[in-house]
């Protein structure tokens, strides 16, 4: 772990609280400010490793909590984890089965591996957001909610516009726990319209 991480006050706070990553505080703030997760919601976390958002979700809902990632996630009580690509129809079918056929909320803190080239990284993050939106439109029940991470840039407005086709309330939100200088911004989408037409492919 690099020194810039260990000197990070949010990181130290997360480790002291028993969270697997500092990102836990981002979801806690999003929930406090936006009320995305309700007490009995079934929630799917995309790109869930190492599992800090799953830890938060487990405490926010008595519903089913399912984490999906290409990499294994260390087990935790009250959480189902799936190793696989969430864009794979077979993985999506298993997610539906684990959720009992009803998914109330989709969240994603997933980020592409960054190259340091701002425009390239932003385009890849937008692509990942498109995939998460298409997934949410496939599995969410009407009235469901979604939170996905993206990066500010020239394509961000297009992803917001696409999301508004499928949710009644959509806004961008930057958390206080985000690192200074980071372009990351979360899309908070509430009240899914129940339609998934045109939610696939490039913007």
Swiss-Prot record:
GO molecular function ontology, one term from the record: rRNA (uridine-2'-O-)-methyltransferase activity
Keyword S-adenosyl-L-methionine: yes
Keyword S-adenosyl-L-methionine: yes
Superkingdom field: Archaea
Swiss-Prot/TrEMBL catalytic activity: uridine(2552) in 23S rRNA + S-adenosyl-L-methionine = 2'-O-methyluridine(2552) in 23S rRNA + S-adenosyl-L-homocysteine + H(+)
UniProt keywords, alphabetically: Cytoplasm, Methyltransferase, rRNA processing, S-adenosyl-L-methionine, Transferase
Enzyme Commission numbers on file: 2.1.1.166
Active site residues per record: 149 (proton acceptor)
GO cellular component: cytoplasm
Gene3D superfamilies: Vaccinia Virus protein VP39 (3.40.50.150)
Binding positions for S-adenosyl-L-methionine per the UniProt entry: 51, 53, 69, 85, 109
Predominant location: cytoplasm
Compartment(s) of residence: Cytoplasm
Similarity remark: Belongs to the class I-like SAM-binding methyltransferase superfamily. RNA methyltransferase RlmE family.
UniProt function note: Specifically methylates the uridine in position 2552 of 23S rRNA at the 2'-O position of the ribose in the fully assembled 50S ribosomal subunit.
Protein name (Swiss-Prot/TrEMBL): Ribosomal RNA large subunit methyltransferase E
UniProt source species: Methanoculleus marisnigri (strain ATCC 35101 / DSM 1498 / JR1)
């Amino acid at each position: 772990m690099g020194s810039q991480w260990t000197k990070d006050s949010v990181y130290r706070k997360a480790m002291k609280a028993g969270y697997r990553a500092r990102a836990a505080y981002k979801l806690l703030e999003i929930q406090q400010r936006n009320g995305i997760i309700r007490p009995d919601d079934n929630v799917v976390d995309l790109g869930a490793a190492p599992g800090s958002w799953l830890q938060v979700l487990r405490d926010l809902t008595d519903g089913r909590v399912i984490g999906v990632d290409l990499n294994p996630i260390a087990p935790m009580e009250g959480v189902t984890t799936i190793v696989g690509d969430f864009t794979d129809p077979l993985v999506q079918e298993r997610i539906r089965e684990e959720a009992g056929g009803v998914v109330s909320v989709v969240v994603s803190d997933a980020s592409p591996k960054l190259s340091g080239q701002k425009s390239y990284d932003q385009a890849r993050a937008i692509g990942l957001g498109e995939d998460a939106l298409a997934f949410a439109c496939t599995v969410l029940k009407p009235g469901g909610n979604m939170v996905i991470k993206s990066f500010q840039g020239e394509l961000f407005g297009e992803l917001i516009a696409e999301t508004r086709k499928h949710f009644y309330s959509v806004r961008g939100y930057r958390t206080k726990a985000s690192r200074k200088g980071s372009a990351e911004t979360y899309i908070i989408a509430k009240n899914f319209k129940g339609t998934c037409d045109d939610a696939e492919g490039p913007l």
